[in-house]
From Swiss-Prot:
Coiled coil: none annotated. The keyword Cytoplasm does not apply. Keywords: Hydrolase, Magnesium. Catalyzes the hydrolysis of nucleoside triphosphates, with a preference for pyrimidine deoxynucleoside triphosphates (dUTP, dTTP and dCTP). Its EC number is 3.6.1.9, 3.6.1.12, 3.6.1.-, 3.6.1.23. A motif (Nudix box) lies at residues 38-59. The lineage of its organism: Bacteria, Pseudomonadati, Pseudomonadota, Gammaproteobacteria, Enterobacterales. It catalyses: a ribonucleoside 5'-triphosphate + H2O = a ribonucleoside 5'-phosphate + diphosphate + H(+); a 2'-deoxyribonucleoside 5'-triphosphate + H2O = a 2'-deoxyribonucleoside 5'-phosphate + diphosphate + H(+); dUTP + H2O = dUMP + diphosphate + H(+); dTTP + H2O = dTMP + diphosphate + H(+). This is Nucleoside triphosphatase NudI. It comes from the Bacteria. PROSITE patterns: NUDIX (PS51462), NUDIX_BOX (PS00893). GO terms for molecular function: dCTP diphosphatase activity; dTTP diphosphatase activity; dUTP diphosphatase activity; magnesium ion binding. InterPro entries: Nucleoside_triphosphatase_NudI, Nudix_hydrolase, NUDIX_hydrolase-like_dom_sf, NUDIX_hydrolase_CS, NUDIX_hydrolase_dom.
Length: 141
Protein backbone atom coordinates (compact mmCIF):
# COMPACT_ATOMS: atom_id res chain seq x y z
CA UNK A 1 0.00 0.00 0.00
CA UNK A 2 1.28 3.41 -0.96
CA UNK A 3 1.77 6.05 1.75
CA UNK A 4 1.17 9.79 1.29
CA UNK A 5 1.85 12.68 3.63
CA UNK A 6 -0.88 15.28 3.14
CA UNK A 7 -0.70 18.95 4.16
CA UNK A 8 -4.12 20.33 4.96
CA UNK A 9 -4.89 23.99 5.72
CA UNK A 10 -7.90 24.91 7.86
CA UNK A 11 -8.25 28.44 6.45
CA UNK A 12 -10.24 31.07 8.34
CA UNK A 13 -11.11 34.61 7.31
CA UNK A 14 -13.35 36.94 9.32
CA UNK A 15 -14.84 34.06 11.29
CA UNK A 16 -15.65 31.90 8.26
CA UNK A 17 -13.89 28.73 7.13
CA UNK A 18 -13.01 27.80 3.56
CA UNK A 19 -14.59 24.62 2.20
CA UNK A 20 -14.02 23.25 -1.29
CA UNK A 21 -16.36 20.88 -3.13
CA UNK A 22 -14.50 18.04 -4.82
CA UNK A 23 -15.32 17.18 -8.43
CA UNK A 24 -17.72 14.27 -8.83
CA UNK A 25 -15.54 11.84 -10.79
CA UNK A 26 -12.20 11.55 -8.95
CA UNK A 27 -10.24 12.08 -5.78
CA UNK A 28 -10.51 10.57 -2.33
CA UNK A 29 -13.95 12.07 -1.60
CA UNK A 30 -15.72 12.67 -4.95
CA UNK A 31 -18.53 15.24 -4.84
CA UNK A 32 -18.17 16.08 -1.16
CA UNK A 33 -17.08 19.24 0.62
CA UNK A 34 -13.55 19.19 2.00
CA UNK A 35 -10.59 21.22 3.11
CA UNK A 36 -8.00 21.92 0.44
CA UNK A 37 -4.56 20.35 0.59
CA UNK A 38 -2.45 17.69 -0.98
CA UNK A 39 0.66 15.57 -0.97
CA UNK A 40 4.17 16.50 0.07
CA UNK A 41 6.59 15.84 -2.80
CA UNK A 42 9.94 14.05 -2.21
CA UNK A 43 12.54 16.49 -0.86
CA UNK A 44 9.94 19.19 -0.21
CA UNK A 45 9.74 20.93 3.16
CA UNK A 46 6.35 20.80 4.90
CA UNK A 47 5.55 24.54 4.79
CA UNK A 48 6.73 24.73 1.17
CA UNK A 49 4.32 21.90 0.32
CA UNK A 50 1.46 23.66 2.14
CA UNK A 51 2.07 26.94 0.29
CA UNK A 52 2.45 25.13 -3.07
CA UNK A 53 -0.80 23.21 -2.59
CA UNK A 54 -2.65 26.41 -1.68
CA UNK A 55 -1.27 28.16 -4.79
CA UNK A 56 -2.11 25.21 -7.06
CA UNK A 57 -5.60 24.59 -5.72
CA UNK A 58 -6.76 28.05 -4.61
CA UNK A 59 -4.76 30.43 -6.80
CA UNK A 60 -1.95 32.94 -6.43
CA UNK A 61 -4.12 35.75 -5.02
CA UNK A 62 -5.03 34.17 -1.66
CA UNK A 63 -2.76 35.68 1.01
CA UNK A 64 -2.14 33.79 4.25
CA UNK A 65 -1.30 36.10 7.15
CA UNK A 66 -0.75 33.27 9.64
CA UNK A 67 0.16 29.57 9.43
CA UNK A 68 0.33 27.50 12.63
CA UNK A 69 0.81 23.73 12.81
CA UNK A 70 -2.21 22.34 14.67
CA UNK A 71 -2.50 18.54 14.68
CA UNK A 72 -1.92 15.36 12.73
CA UNK A 73 -3.72 12.07 12.17
CA UNK A 74 -3.79 9.14 9.80
CA UNK A 75 -6.16 6.76 8.07
CA UNK A 76 -6.56 4.57 5.00
CA UNK A 77 -8.55 5.92 2.04
CA UNK A 78 -9.49 4.78 -1.45
CA UNK A 79 -8.60 7.28 -4.18
CA UNK A 80 -10.54 7.24 -7.46
CA UNK A 81 -8.67 8.42 -10.56
CA UNK A 82 -10.22 10.16 -13.59
CA UNK A 83 -9.96 6.91 -15.60
CA UNK A 84 -11.96 5.05 -12.93
CA UNK A 85 -9.03 3.20 -11.36
CA UNK A 86 -9.00 3.02 -7.58
CA UNK A 87 -6.10 2.77 -5.14
CA UNK A 88 -5.99 2.24 -1.39
CA UNK A 89 -3.57 4.72 0.24
CA UNK A 90 -2.29 5.14 3.79
CA UNK A 91 -2.69 8.89 4.46
CA UNK A 92 -0.83 10.92 7.09
CA UNK A 93 -2.53 14.30 7.51
CA UNK A 94 -0.59 17.33 8.80
CA UNK A 95 -3.23 19.94 9.60
CA UNK A 96 -2.52 23.66 9.90
CA UNK A 97 -4.54 26.55 11.33
CA UNK A 98 -4.33 29.30 8.72
CA UNK A 99 -5.68 32.84 8.60
CA UNK A 100 -6.12 34.52 5.24
CA UNK A 101 -5.88 38.26 4.69
CA UNK A 102 -8.41 38.09 1.84
CA UNK A 103 -10.92 35.80 0.13
CA UNK A 104 -9.47 35.88 -3.39
CA UNK A 105 -9.91 32.29 -4.57
CA UNK A 106 -9.44 30.76 -8.02
CA UNK A 107 -10.06 27.01 -7.68
CA UNK A 108 -8.36 24.48 -9.94
CA UNK A 109 -9.95 21.48 -11.66
CA UNK A 110 -9.90 19.33 -8.49
CA UNK A 111 -12.84 21.36 -7.18
CA UNK A 112 -16.22 22.33 -8.60
CA UNK A 113 -17.07 25.00 -6.02
CA UNK A 114 -15.94 26.69 -2.83
CA UNK A 115 -17.59 28.53 0.06
CA UNK A 116 -16.63 30.64 3.07
CA UNK A 117 -18.79 29.12 5.80
CA UNK A 118 -19.79 30.38 9.25
CA UNK A 119 -19.08 27.81 12.01
CA UNK A 120 -22.78 27.37 12.78
CA UNK A 121 -23.45 26.47 9.11
CA UNK A 122 -20.66 23.89 8.64
CA UNK A 123 -22.94 20.96 9.56
CA UNK A 124 -25.29 21.89 6.68
CA UNK A 125 -22.66 20.84 4.11
CA UNK A 126 -22.07 17.29 2.82
CA UNK A 127 -18.64 17.09 4.44
CA UNK A 128 -16.38 14.13 3.80
CA UNK A 129 -15.56 12.00 6.82
CA UNK A 130 -12.00 13.34 7.18
CA UNK A 131 -13.14 16.99 7.12
CA UNK A 132 -15.99 16.22 9.51
CA UNK A 133 -13.49 14.62 11.91
CA UNK A 134 -11.08 17.58 11.65
CA UNK A 135 -13.81 20.16 12.26
CA UNK A 136 -15.15 18.16 15.21
CA UNK A 137 -11.65 18.02 16.75
CA UNK A 138 -11.53 21.80 16.40
CA UNK A 139 -14.88 22.10 18.21
CA UNK A 140 -16.63 23.46 15.12
CA UNK A 141 -19.14 20.59 14.76
Amino acid sequence: MRQRTIVCPLIQNDGCYLLCKMVDNRGVFPGQWALSGGGVEPGERIEEALRREIREELGEQLILSDITPWTFRDDIRVKTYADGRQEEIYMIYLIFDCVSANRDICINDEFQDYAWVKPEELALYDLNVATRHTLALKGLL
